[in-house]
Every structure is written in C-alpha cells, then in structure tokens.
Amino acid sequence: MSERIQNVQPKEWNGTKYRSTLEAETAQTLTALGIPFEYESRKITLQDGFRSPFQKDKVRALTYKPDFIIGSIMLECKGFETPEWKIKKKLIFKYLMENEPDVIFHQTHDAKKSLLEALDGHWAYLGYCIEVSPKPKKKGSVSCNHVTTQKYDSIQEAMAALHLKGKALGPILNSLIGEREYVYGYKWSLLKIKM
C-alpha cells in the first residue's frame, strides 16, 4: 500500500465518519449546494472470488464501494492515484459498461473546482435551480446587480429565457453557508460572486 494512502486521516463531519478529509469536504460542499447524496451505500463485486492451484487460500473477491452516490452518478474522491487504483478503475469502467450503462462515474481530486466540474451537465437530471445574470458589459467583470430572481430548472432553460449564447459551464459555490447564487461571466462560465 502506498505511503500516501496510509497517511490519509479519517475525519468526522455532521455525525458521519469519513475515510479522508477530502471525502468530508466533499460532503460539506454537496450539503451546502443542497445536493442529496448517499455515502458508501453500495458494494459492487468487480470479480468473484475463486480457488487457485497456486495458493492454499481462496482468492478473495475484488469489490468496490463508491464514496458517493448522487442519483445515477458514482463519485469517487481520490487525492492521489496509486497504481492499484488505476487498475481497479479500469475494472469499474468495464463493470459499469456491461451491467449499469446508465450510471455515470466521476472522480474528483478536490472538494471545489474538480467536484463541480464533475457534476457539470447533470443539473437538469438532478432537478436543481440556478440564478443567472446577463453578460457583464466589461470583459471579465461580474456584477451582482444583474442577478435575476427567476429560477430555472436547468442552465439551458435559463440561457434560452435570457437569450444568452455560448457554452454553459458548471456552477461555482458562492460560499459554504447554504447560499445558492450564480452568475454568468463573459465566457459563459459560472463565476464565484465575491460578497
């Protein structure tokens, strides 16, 4: 086992003990965004156990327990990829393609940017609402004055209603205090509002 993995410290948050600080921070971010999730609620058998003529003991089954289940999304938190994990990930992909083709697998390396990028594009399915502003007048500027009070069920619906064109990117969390305020920047990415 990798020394880096051995040094991962469990952390408790909101009454649940998580296997790492990254997992706890991910749970905090999802909770702050109001995204319902299940933590380590499933176990998948990637390869059944078997007996081998080359060793006395039975070879144990190879299993995988996703860190988070969010609707049809499996979310894995990995700060560092070990060689063992890289092999296991390939088996996870194979299992999902053959057994659960509708399930989406994502891996995140942090509880902020890569997490939100992993969830990008699934808002309509998850049924969340967003607030969107028109394009700022000055390139790169963000103005809170133009945030609409109308809520939309998807980024695409909001863009159509406001006659916005361009590629919509994922939402950025305003703060970890339960607020949900989003705004479009000049590149049509959703930028963090500084309060």
What kind of feature is each model-predicted range?
Residues 160-174:
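Short, basic interhelical loop/turn and adjoining N-cap
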